[in-house]
Structures are given as structure tokens and as C-alpha cells.
Amino acid sequence: TESEELFYADNTFLTLGGTSAIYKRTTNPHTTIGDGLALAFNAGCEIADMEFIQFHPSAIYTESEEAFLISEAVRGEGAYLIDQNGERFMPAIHELAELAPRDIVAQSIYRQMLKYDQEYVWLSLKHLDPQVVKHRFPNIYEKCQELGIDMCDRIPVAPAAHYMVGGVRTDTHGQTNIKRLFICGELASSGIMGANRLASNSLIECLVFGKRAIEASRKNLKTSPTQVFKPIYHCNDNYAALYVHLKKEISRIMTDYAGIIRNAEKLKQGLNELESLEDNLPREINEYYTLICRNLITVARLIIRSALYRQESRGGHFREDYPCSDASYLFHIVQQKEKDLRTLPVNTKKSLN
């Protein structure tokens, strides 16, 4: 119709995914910039545990920053992570070597990259049977071929932002603190992931909590809307370049200051640079590109503030200035618009009622 239309519902569901694309390298689509998170935050939702960002250890490295995921199954098949000298480094770090938890492997790879001033390490499969590799991993093999990489030899890999463990705080039926607003999928923070995430558990979460949210929403059905609003946003194409520039700057800030290995100095520097970016944004509150620029800054700030508050290392959050876990930090960090950051105890006895 080439016109704006509003549809009114008895219940609203947000299923807009995570925030990983605010980092330089991500296994996610480039659109996963956390706009759903910013939307919920600005509406008054409680946002929980945003410091826990999971980085997948092994995504293909290319100069274009494309980060195609190399499954843990490849390492499970026997592939080795090797440094620039061709030496394995994981056996000296963890008893499970290449099969250690994702956060341990990602941190270890990142340290090797810093040590040798390189953008990647190698995932070596040259000691494995090429026919087995091709048969077991046809999709990965095909992708490597497209990129001019011989998977049966070695693959350049580096960590990439993969999953947002935190998100909009919900109960076990997907209900937020705002009545009739439900959140499902990666955008939700139901608490079941803890500080980390086991591979593929998020798929089960979508199925289970999606079904429960639908069942809960049926209690709210009405026959007619109670309020009517007119669209208020417009789009100024002159600001498109501003968005591209700002997204690049924020991905740099998040990668350099709030990435795999963090510390207080870097996190504070990140907050300062975000504030500077925000101060230079246009003042058109209801313009589309300005809105998504502000959303990007909002999401980045939520992550950094939470990471700065948690003065310990736990799960997907590692502080080199606080490298050990601390039992006194066994709580959820909750942020809400125009309210002070607060903490909530972890409910270790939660059941699905």
C-alpha cells in the first residue's frame, strides 16, 4: 500500500534475536544488532545478564570479516588448534585440550593472536583422513572450497561473537514485567542458560518457551483494541551513511574494549567513547537512522555497564583484572531505563510450573 499501518494485538511477542553483530566478527546475520533489546529496554522492560556474551572459538578468518562457523564437531573429530609455529597450544591449557569449554578455547585463541600479533590461529586437519573429513563435514568443506581454503590441510580460524546469553528478563512463560509483552528465543533471558550456554540448548529453549508463551498469552485475549496511535517515524536517507559509520565504530569499541578478555580500564574507555558518539548524533528523535544509531549505543552500553559491575570471571564473561569466580557475585545484574542497576539472587530451585 506504500503507507504505514499499525496492527493492534491483545498480546505482543518480540522474537528479534541477539546482539552479536555489534562486534566486528560474528557468526550471526549482520542484522542482529539488538534492536529488539533496545525496543524492550526503552519500553521499560528489565534487561538481565548482558555481560555474558558467548564467543564461538572457531569461525573461519577472512579479510572481509566473514565468520563462517566451524563446528566443535570438527575438533571432536580430532582437529588440532596450532599456533603460527605449527605447535598445539591447548593441551598445556586445559585437560580437554581442543574440546575444553567454548569460553576457555576462545580466550586461549585470543591470547595466541595477541602473542604473535596475528588475526587468527590454524585449525589443522592434515593428520586426518581426507575422505572422512569430506564425508563428515560436507557443508563446511564446500564453504572452504568457495573461500579457496583446503579444509583437509588447515583452516585459519578466530573467535567470533555467537550468542547473547542475557536479554530481556522473563518468567518461565516468556512474560516480561510489562503485561501482555512476551519475549522468546535469544532475546529472552529466562535464566536457564546461567552464565554460559551449551551448544544447541537455545534451539530447545525456543521450542519449549515459545509454546509456553503462546499458552500463557491465550488468557489475555480480548475482542477490540483499547488504544490507537498514529505512526510518528520518518526516514531521512541522508543519515544512512551516518548509521554505517556508527555501526563500524561501535563494533570496534565492543571488540577492543568489551570483547573476549576485559578489564576495568578498557570497559570505562568503551563507555567514554560511546558517550562521545551519542553526543554527536543528530537531534531528530523520530528519524529512522537516528533511532537505530541510538539503539546501537543503548545495547553496547547495557553490555559494558553490566561487564563493569561484575568484578569476577564467570562463564562467557572474563575479566583479566578479576580472573577468578567469586561466590559473592552469584546474582543476576538487572538494568531498567531511568532506574539504578540492581541485582537479584539466582534461583537455583526454579521449576517449570
Predicted feature locations:
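Glycine- and aromatic-enriched mobile tails/lids
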Residues: I82-P91, E98, I109-Q112, Y163-V165, ...
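FAD/FMN-dependent oxidoreductases across multiple families
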Residues: P138-F182
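Core beta-strand elements of the Rossmann-like FAD/NAD(P) dinucleotide-binding domain
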Residues: S3-N11, N177-I178
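Hydrophobic/aromatic ligand-binding patch that stacks against planar heteroaromatic rings
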Residues: T12, L39, H173
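An anion/pyrophosphate-binding glycine-rich loop and adjacent beta-alpha core
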Residues: L39, C45-P156, A216-K222
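Thiamine diphosphate
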Residues: N28-F41, I47
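Glycine-/small-residue-rich beta->alpha transition segments that form the dinucleotide
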Residues: N11, T15-S20, L187
